[in-house]
Regions:
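Short, low-complexity N-terminal leaders and the immediately following helix N-cap/first helix
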Residues: 1-69, 75
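Short, glycine/charged-enriched hinge/interface segments at domain edges or termini
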Residues: 2, 58-152
Length: 152
C-alpha cells in the first residue's frame, strides 16, 4: 500500500517535478482548442463614449421641465448625427440634435427621446413629457468596464 503524503510534502514533490508550461501568442483563429495562459481584460470601456439607444433626439433634460400635452416644449434642431459620425455642435438651452441609434451623444445633451414619442418638423422637435438627465442613454462602460475579465 502507498504511503499517504501530507500536503507540504506533496506540494514540494509536485513543484520539484513540474516545469512551467511554455506560452505563445497566437491569433484568435489559431486559438481554438487552446488554453489561455492568463486572463484577458478589456483595455478600455465599451462603449467608450455615451451613445443613443434609439433613433430620436438628444437634448438637455432641464429644457423639458413642466412639459405636457397642454404645455409642450419645442426645441430647435441644431444638427443630425448618424451612427458612425461624431457630433460637431453642442446642445444648448432650447436646442436638440437629431440622433440615430448608436451615435454619440453631443456635448450638453443628457437625455434622448425616441422619434415616436415626439412631433417633429425639419427644424424642430416637440416633447410632451418631462425627462430626467440620464434618460435613454447608453453610458460609457455600460456593456464592459475597462479591466473587466473577458476570457479566462
Amino acid at each position: 500500500m502507498s504511503e499517504m503524503l501530507e500536503y507540504p510534502a506533496l506540494r514540494s514533490l509536485l513543484l520539484e517535478h513540474s516545469r512551467p508550461v511554455e506560452t505563445e501568442t497566437v491569433s484568435l483563429d489559431e486559438s481554438r482548442g487552446r488554453v489561455l495562459a492568463e486572463d484577458r481584460k478589456a483595455r478600455f470601456p465599451i462603449p467608450d463614449f455615451p451613445k443613443s439607444p434609439y433613433d430620436g433626439y438628444a437634448f438637455r433634460a432641464a429644457d423639458t421641465a413642466g412639459a405636457s400635452r397642454e404645455h409642450p416644449v419645442t426645441l430647435a434642431i441644431v444638427e443630425e448625427i448618424p451612427a458612425g459620425s461624431f457630433p460637431t455642435k453642442s446642445v444648448t438651452a432650447g436646442t436638440a440634435a437629431k440622433i440615430l441609434t448608436g451615435a454619440p451623444i453631443p456635448e450638453g445633451a443628457d437625455a434622448v427621446i425616441p422619434f415616436e414619442k415626439t412631433e417633429f418638423t425639419e427644424g424642430t422637435v416637440t416633447l410632451f413629457a418631462p425627462m430626467r438627465a440620464g434618460d435613454n442613454l447608453i453610458r460609457i462602460g455600460e456593456d464592459v468596464d475597462a479591466d473587466t475579465v473577458l476570457a479566462r
